[in-house]
From Swiss-Prot:
Zn-finger region bounds: Phorbol-ester/DAG-type: 117-165
GO biological processes: apoptotic process; lymphocyte proliferation; negative regulation of lymphocyte proliferation; positive regulation of protein ubiquitination; regulation of protein localization to nucleus; signal transduction
Biological function: Potential tumor suppressor. Seems to be involved in lymphocyte adhesion by linking RAP1A activation upon T-cell receptor or chemokine stimulation to integrin activation. Isoform 2 stimulates lymphocyte polarization and the patch-like distribution of ITGAL/LFA-1, resulting in an enhanced adhesion to ICAM1. Together with RAP1A may participate in regulation of microtubule growth. The association of isoform 2 with activated RAP1A is required for directional movement of endothelial cells during wound healing. May be involved in regulation of Ras apoptotic function.
Record gene name: Rassf5
Cellular location(s): Cytoplasm; Cytoplasm, Cytoskeleton
Protein name: Ras association domain-containing protein 5
Species assigned in the record: Mus musculus
Documented effect of changing residue 236 to A: Reduced interaction with HRAS
Residue ranges of every copy of the SARAH domain listed in the record: 361-408
Main location: cytoplasm
């Protein structure tokens, strides 16, 4: 029996996508086994009729086979019920296959909340308008606030709250993040305003301060001075937000393309959800010497995809002195990196804290003229409602007094 031709198998395949092809036998009349279905035999490797079949010739033919052309390969038939997939090269990156047997709205691992545990009391906003944690709109003069978790909202938004109180059993406690356990805690009962007189330094003084700062920095987060006199560096901001924040619901995280093209994923949906951030979470930002406090707040909200108004928040600088903690609210035009440069890299000397803007100071210059006119319209409406309620209250009181007087006139006194 003649040996099979080069590139053939001595046994038939069971799943051949096409009828087997036979080549001319080298020495006998018996047809060789069927050819390999996914491989094409080059013409140069097929020996002519009457060629020598010695062992050396076969070895030389097997030793240096030519590469198989891609067009001669036959694709495997796709099994019914499966989608065709591309075959990746060996060693190439394979995307992670993450699947879930649950749909997002029906995921049993996500506990359903119904707005339970809140203990709302009336709050008078004397310093200026506040912000509703549910709808995000301004709250003027009168609001409702939970005594436990500080959730603030309009009176008409009370029935629409679905977020449970995180401190149902009592007053709000600090739910700290893992980063906060690495730093010692001091007495934070003292909050005073610290006023400092600062003079703009020269470029030579800035260079000396940057060299001194980098020599004391131990985490490779130094500052770099540019030729135009500006410099860049890192700051850490502690997030101490007791009230919930609002984020868009049902969208994917921000990709590199969105960050480069400045695409806001929150603008693609109108669905909103609220949750509580861990107290004292730490976020690191890379900013320049021209970055203001307002830009730092907007950058933090963008990183967490928070859609609340930036005026709802304020940036404070925290100074540790004599075992006490002194807070000072920074103006929206201050430069945090310059303050970091003056204080040095030690966070025990100076640190930045993001909190709710509830100091009673309102930046009226940040509002547009239509917004200010809207404030006046809402205030006038609330004033008329209060006047109507007072008139109705005292009218009922007068009617009861008159009825009591009429009843007392017929009785001997």
């Amino acid at each position: 029996m003649a040996s099979p031709a080069i590139g053939q198998r001595p046994y038939p395949l069971l799943l051949d996508p096409e009828p087997p092809r036979y080549l001319q036998s080298l020495g006998g009349t018996e047809p060789p086994p069927p050819a390999r279905p996914r491989r094409c035999i080059p013409t140069a490797l097929i020996p002519a009729a009457g060629a020598s079949e010695d062992r050396g010739g076969r070895r030389s033919g097997r030793r240096d086979p030519e590469p198989t052309p891609r067009d001669c390969r036959h694709a495997r038939p796709v099994r019914p019920g499966l989608q065709p997939r591309l075959r990746l090269r060996p060693g190439s990156h394979r995307p992670r296959d993450v699947r879930s047997i649950f749909e997002q709205p029906q995921d049993p691992r996500v506990l359903a909340e119904r707005g339970e545990g809140h203990r709302f009391v009336e709050l008078a906003l004397r310093g200026g308008p506040g912000w509703c944690d549910l709808c995000g709109r301004e709250v003027l003069r009168q609001a409702l606030r939970c005594a436990n978790c500080k959730f603030t909202c309009h009176s008409e938004c009370r029935s629409l709250i679905q977020l449970d109180c995180r401190q149902k059993g009592g007053p709000a406690l600090d739910r700290r993040s893992p980063e906060s356990t690495l730093t010692p805690t001091l007495n934070q009962n003292v909050c005073k305003a610290v006023e400092e007189t600062q003079h703009p330094p020269t470029i030579q003084e800035i260079k000396q301060k940057i060299d001194s700062y980098n020599s004391r920095e131990k985490h490779c987060l130094g500052m770099k001075l540019s030729e135009d006199g500006t410099y860049t560096g890192f700051i850490k901001v502690h997030l101490k937000l007791r009230r919930p924040v609002t984020v868009p619901a049902g969208i994917r995280p921000q990709s590199i393309y969105d960050a480069i093209k400045e695409v806001n994923p929150a603008a693609t949906t109108d669905k909103r959800t609220s949750f509580y951030l861990p107290l004292d979470a730490i976020k690191q930002l890379h900013i320049s010497s021209t970055t203001t406090v307002s830009e730092v707040i907007q950058g933090l909200l963008k990183k967490f995809m928070v859609v609340d108004n930036p005026q709802k928040f304020a940036l404070f600088k925290r100074i540790h002195k004599d075992g006490q903690v002194l807070f000072q609210k920074l103006s929206i035009a201050d430069y945090p990196l310059y303050l970091r440069l003056l204080a040095g890299p030690d966070t025990d000397v100076l640190s930045f804290v993001l909190k709710e803007n509830e100091t009673g100071e309102v930046e009226w210059d940040a509002f547009s003229i239509p917004e200010l006119q809207n404030f006046l319209t809402i205030l006038e409406k609330e004033e008329q409602d209060k006047i109507h309620q007072l008139q109705k209250k005292y009218n009922k009181f007068r009617q009861k007094l008159e009825e009591a007087l009429r009843e007392s006139q017929g009785k001997p006194g």
